[in-house]
C-alpha cells in the first residue's frame, strides 16, 4: 500500500513534553533516601524534566550499563531520544537521536520481545521517521508500525498507552485517506478510562500518556 501520510500524531514538542511532566510528577517525592539505582533514575528523570535531554540520556545510559537486570534505563534512553527527535528538523540530528534510541531499545527487545511498552516505543521510533520525512518513510514504515501496535494490543489490551498510541497513529492514516475517525476516537476514550485504573509496577515504570490522550480527545472529530 502506497502512502505518504503526513504523520504528526504526537504534535511534536509541546505535546510530547506532557510525557516529561507526568513522569517527573510521579517520581519527584520518591527519590530521597533511596538506593543508588533509584537515585540515579530520579536524577535522570529530573534532568529530562528540566529540558536537559542530552544529559538525561547520558545518565540513563550509565545506569543501563551498571544495572543490566532492569529494562527501564534503556527504555528511557529510547524514549528521551525519540521525544527529542520529534522536535528536531535537522536530518543529521534526527538520525543521531533515533539511532541512539534504536540501539538502546534493541538491547531490551532482544531480552524480551513481548514487552508491550517496548513495542510502543519501537512504533514511536518508526513514527518519528515518518513524521520527519513522510514521502520517503511513510510507505515502508506505516505497515510495521501497525504490526507493532497489533502485537502490543494482543499482549496487553488493557495497557492505556497501547490503546491510545495505536488509535492516535490510525487517526493520522484516516485523515490522510479521508476515512472516518470515529472508531479511533472511541478507542481514545477507552484509553482515558484505562489510564484511571492502570497501576505502574514501580514508580519508574511507564505511566505517561493521559494528558496526550485528553488533548487528542478534544481534537477528535
Language model: regions and residue ranges:
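Alpha-helical segment of the N-proximal tetratricopeptide repeat
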Residues: 39-54, 59, 87
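Outer-membrane beta-barrel transmembrane domain signature
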Residues: 137-145, 149-152, 157-163, 170-179
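Short coil/turn connectors between adjacent alpha-helices in alpha-solenoid helical repeat scaffolds
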Residues: 44-48, 85-97, 129-141, 173-183
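TPR/TPR-like (Sel1-like) alpha-helical repeat modules
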Residues: 97, 102, 139-147, 178-199
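Bacterial Sec-dependent N-terminal signal peptides
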Residues: 1-40
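Canonical positions in the second alpha-helix
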Residues: 63, 108, 151-152, 191
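Amphipathic alpha-helical repeat scaffolds of TPR domains
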Residues: 35-42, 66-87, 114-132, 160-173, ...
